Amino acid sequence: MAKTSRKVTMALAVSAALLTARAATAADTPERATIVLHVDDFANLLGTDLNAAEAVASRIFAAAGIRTVWVHGRDKGPRIGGALHVKVLVLSREMAEQKISADGVGPAVLGQAAKVCGRAYIFSHRIDALAQKSQRYVGDLLGRVLAHEVGHLLLPENSHSASGIMAAAIDLRPSSVVAFTQQQTAAIRQAIASAN
């Protein structure tokens, strides 16, 4: 009986130690920066292309330690404490051409970010044309443009870099780096933290 009692006491002590360690670890770990992207697909993209694009953009943000949650249409999505919400509008050709004309957008621009209202505008017809011309998968290019434009929403003005995902022109070379710089990562994480 005494032997069993000691085993039970020891098991309880080990369990308490493990639970305390787990609670301390959870409390000491900072909450992961999260962006909730509310997507309106006015271009009616193929679901596989949009899913692939979201996966590409998610990988780019994940490499910076940032979690992405994608919400489509009128769905409000999950409530996530500390998350920053942005709007992504994948424009139809007609909508994009109106915006391009109204804003005087250059012919090589694939999207625009309006930081004031937290919206990224994606010119899907231009991305599709570039994908065909460069023989690249549209989902990959769309994902890069999504990450780039959302990056503009979170970074200071004039945030283009010489290379990486925030380069002014999309780099189609297979060896290109498709990531945020360390400075950009820090700035994005700070923007998410200060928005809350």
Task: Name each model-derived stretch.
Residues 159, 165-196:
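Post-HExxH zinc-binding segment in Zn-dependent metallohydrolases
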Residues 21-28:
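Boundary at the C-terminal end of the N-terminal hydrophobic targeting segment
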Residues 40-42, 89-95, 125-127, 158, ...:
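Solvent-exposed coil/turn segments that connect beta secondary-structure elements
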Residues 30-45, 125-131:
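Acidic/histidine-rich, surface-exposed loop or edge segments in extracytoplasmic proteins
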